[in-house]
């Protein structure tokens, strides 16, 4: 399956799951291509812009909110993890991979800032879409650099595929280079789950930490 087919499928799934403007659905999907060395540094959007359209709180809302999909994988300590164990705490769920050169580290840094600014308990959950390289020890080393108490999850190929499908996340490995190195094209959104386990927001790449804080405050009742 080509990258275009994957991107089309991801856009269709996202559009079916969340009421957001089509331009934001496309921006979320197309910006993920920057994780690939063959992808563009910038993506052209309707109107000729080279950056994603501004994101507002209204653009991100699941209407209505719905129970977050199941997420049962292995954490960076090699222990079984169930998203349900975080009930009572807000969570920001992001699918990415440790070899991502740009979008993933940018997103995680922004989520770290947002979580610290929010000032109330919130867990950032990083789910790999590259389990072949992202073992539990590899994820631990990667997330430890952020010094933010992130939860990192991995699993078998089948387990990751099941989780990604449940969350409407698309991903695909790019062709490897002569040294066996490869990049991944993937959905680049962050998912906000409230303390009752409800999926509240689909936050496109490029949303500011201030917006994320605002969404957290709304989801927590202030």
How would you label these PLM feature ranges?
Residues 159-215:
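Thiol/disulfide oxidoreductase modules built on the thioredoxin-like
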Residues 84-111:
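Short active-site neighborhood of thiol/selenol oxidoreductases, capturing the structured segment around
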Residues 66, 90, 115-118, 143-146, ...:
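Sec/Tat-exported extracytoplasmic proteins
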Residues 1-70, 74, 222:
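N-terminal targeting signals for export/organelle localization
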Residues 68-69, 91, 187-189:
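Short loop/turn microsegments at loop-to-beta-strand junctions
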Residues 71-91:
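A short beta-strand-turn-helix
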Residues 106-163:
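Structural microenvironment flanking redox-active thiols in thiol-disulfide oxidoreductases
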């Amino acid at each position: 399956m080509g990258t275009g087919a994957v991107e089309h499928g991801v856009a269709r799934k996202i559009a079916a799951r969340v009421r957001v403007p089509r331009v934001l659905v496309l921006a979320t999907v197309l910006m993920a291509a920057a994780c690939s060395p063959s992808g563009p540094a910038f993506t052209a959007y309707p109107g000729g812009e080279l950056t994603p359209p501004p994101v507002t709180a209204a653009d991100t809302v699941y209407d209505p909110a719905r129970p977050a999909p199941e997420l049962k994988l292995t954490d960076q300590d090699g222990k079984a993890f169930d998203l349900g164990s975080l009930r009572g705490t807000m969570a920001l769920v992001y699918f990415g991979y440790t070899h991502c050169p740009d979008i993933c580290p940018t997103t995680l840094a922004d989520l770290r800032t947002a979580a610290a600014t929010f000032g109330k308990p919130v867990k950032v959950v990083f789910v790999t879409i590259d389990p072949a390289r992202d073992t539990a020890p590899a994820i631990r080393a990667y997330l430890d650099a952020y010094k933010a108490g992130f939860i990192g999850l991995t699993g078998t190929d089948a387990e990751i595929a099941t989780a990604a499908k449940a969350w409407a996340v698309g991903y695909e490995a790019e062709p490897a280079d002569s040294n066996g190195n490869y990049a991944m094209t993937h959905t680049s959104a962050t998912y906000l789950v409230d303390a009752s386990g409800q999926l509240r927001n689909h936050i496109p790449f490029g949303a500011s930490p201030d917006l994320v804080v605002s969404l957290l405050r709304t989801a927590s009742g202030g």
